[in-house]
């Protein structure tokens, strides 16, 4: 970690009512003396002139000084809050840079200083960027929850439980005559099962948080001419796909990225699924299945004029059986304008069934509300936290080590191997908060931040 004193504009570039220059590091007091003529009283707003080297006034505004470690970065911090014209701010940065030993901050470097000085853990630092980039109230609230430590608290709790269990197992190993009794008395198994249950809950919440941040991938799939492209157009609000009465019109994957009340949704229209000898259509169908395998949700599009069935296993058992076991399915019975079906929403064999007319728009709004609900949209904006893909991967890795540990306990009564799996689980979880994290990963994370954060 560098000990350089860094400076950057903390407000967005361009014209604004207020512009803020932030300085962090040991030389912040030197900057204060050079630009202000004095060091402001700690944590007090000091209205004063900002002067150049000749003593001429560049601007007037508020100076704030925070003495480390009681600051955002943990270093001495000086903020100069002046008028928001870009020329004025550039002049002020130029003046600050005349003080020996300063340099311009890299993107995210103020937050990186805070992380390195234990003012934030890595999930909280990432939440700052997520809060800035939030595209909905739900995403903003979830990012704020992460910034305030909701995600971190759950991870720290898991790490503590895993560590305590590991110490208990290692204590049993230290007394080999009693090791088997320790491993078979039920206490370790009960603790391990409790941790597994806790981790499952955190994984579910994290997956929801990832969808709020990154969006949900929804694949529209079904037989040819079921109305898949019409539904894509209805959801997108524009004519993205060509629609004809000819079965097999869509031969490739079509993508649309939309927002429902600010929440990102990635909709994918696919070629109609059927047996075909057409080479191009075959490639399109293969691509459709590739998209289905990585989807968060499948909208199973059914032409309501061809069947009255609502159970997806009855409609097309081969299609349902081929889907990944963990993939959620929503049945969409289309062409309700022709069948005269009631637009009610029902449940069948564990699946939601929607009746719509993609052509006229009947029932599409209800389907949008359903998709918002699946993405975690909450009108009361309570609860939840933001999660990133790296968090999900770390949680999956931790879970796999726990499962291997259970096997070592239940099948082999192997205390040393159980302890090792618990150690690996602990390390995977600790990577989330940054306790065990490579410099390359830190660089990648913080370089995506705004300059000045």
Curated annotation (Swiss-Prot):
One cellular component (GO) term of this entry: cytosol
Gene Ontology annotations of biological process type: tRNA methylation; tRNA wobble uridine modification
Binding positions (K(+)): 225, 244, 246, 249
Cofactor note: Binds 1 potassium ion per subunit.
Top-rank EC class of the record's enzyme: hydrolase
GO molecular function: GTP binding; GTPase activity; metal ion binding
Principal location class: cytoplasm
Compartments where located: Cytoplasm
Binding site for Mg(2+): 229, 250
Superkingdom field: Bacteria
Function of the molecule: Exhibits a very high intrinsic GTPase hydrolysis rate. Involved in the addition of a carboxymethylaminomethyl (cmnm) group at the wobble position (U34) of certain tRNAs, forming tRNA-cmnm(5)s(2)U34.
Protein name per Swiss-Prot or TrEMBL: tRNA modification GTPase MnmE
Species of origin: Shewanella pealeana (strain ATCC 700345 / ANG-SQ1)
Gene field: mnmE
């Amino acid at each position: 970690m560098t000990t350089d004193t860094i400076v950057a504009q903390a407000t967005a570039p361009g014209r604004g009512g207020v512009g803020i220059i932030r300085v962090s590091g040991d030389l912040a007091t030197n900057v204060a003396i050079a630009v202000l003529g004095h060091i402001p009283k700690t944590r007090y707003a000091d209205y004063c002139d900002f002067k150049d080297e000749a003593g001429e006034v560049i601007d007037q505004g508020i100076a704030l000084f925070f003495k480390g470690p009681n600051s955002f970065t943990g270093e001495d911090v000086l903020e100069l809050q002046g008028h928001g014209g870009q020329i004025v701010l550039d002049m002020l940065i130029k003046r600050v840079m005349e003080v020996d030993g300063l340099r311009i901050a890299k993107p995210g470097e103020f937050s990186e200083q805070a992380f390195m000085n234990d003012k934030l853990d890595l999930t909280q630092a990432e939440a700052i960027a997520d809060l800035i980039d939030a595209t909905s109230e739900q995403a903003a609230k979830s990012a704020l929850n992460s910034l305030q430590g909701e995600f971190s608290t759950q991870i720290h709790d898991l790490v503590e439980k895993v560590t305590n269990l590991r110490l208990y197992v290692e204590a049993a190993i230290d007394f080999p005559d009693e090791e088997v009794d320790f491993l078979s008395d039920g206490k370790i198994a009960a603790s391990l099962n409790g941790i597994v249950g806790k981790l499952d809950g955190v994984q579910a919440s994290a997956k929801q948080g990832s969808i709020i941040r990154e969006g949900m991938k929804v694949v529209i799939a079904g037989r040819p001419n079921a109305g898949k492209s019409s539904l894509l157009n209805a959801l997108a609000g524009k004519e993205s796909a060509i629609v004809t009465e000819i079965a097999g019109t869509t031969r490739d994957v079509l993508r649309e990225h939309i927002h429902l009340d600010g929440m990102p949704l990635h909709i994918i229209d696919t070629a109609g699924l059927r047996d075909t000898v057409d080479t191009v259509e075959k490639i399109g169908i293969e691509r459709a299945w590739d998209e289905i395998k990585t989807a968060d949700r499948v909208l199973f599009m059914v032409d309501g004029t061809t069947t009255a069935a609502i159970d997806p296993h009855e409609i097309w058992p081969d299609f349902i059986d081929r889907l990944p076991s963990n993939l959620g399915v929503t049945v969409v019975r289309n062409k309700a304008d022709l069948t005269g079906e009631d637009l009610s929403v029902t449940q069948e064999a564990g699946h939601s069934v929607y009746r719509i007319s993609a052509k006229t728009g009947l029932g599409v709004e209800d389907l949008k509300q359903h998709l918002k609900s699946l993405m975690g949209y909450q009108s009361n904006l309570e609860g939840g936290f933001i999660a990133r893909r790296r968090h999900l991967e770390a949680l999956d890795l931790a879970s796999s080590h726990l499962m291997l540990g259970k096997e070592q306990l239940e099948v082999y009564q192997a205390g040393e191997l159980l302890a090792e799996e618990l150690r690996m689980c602990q390390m995977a979880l600790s990577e989330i908060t940054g306790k065990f994290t490579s410099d390359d990963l830190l660089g990648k994370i913080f370089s995506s931040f705004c300059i000045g954060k």
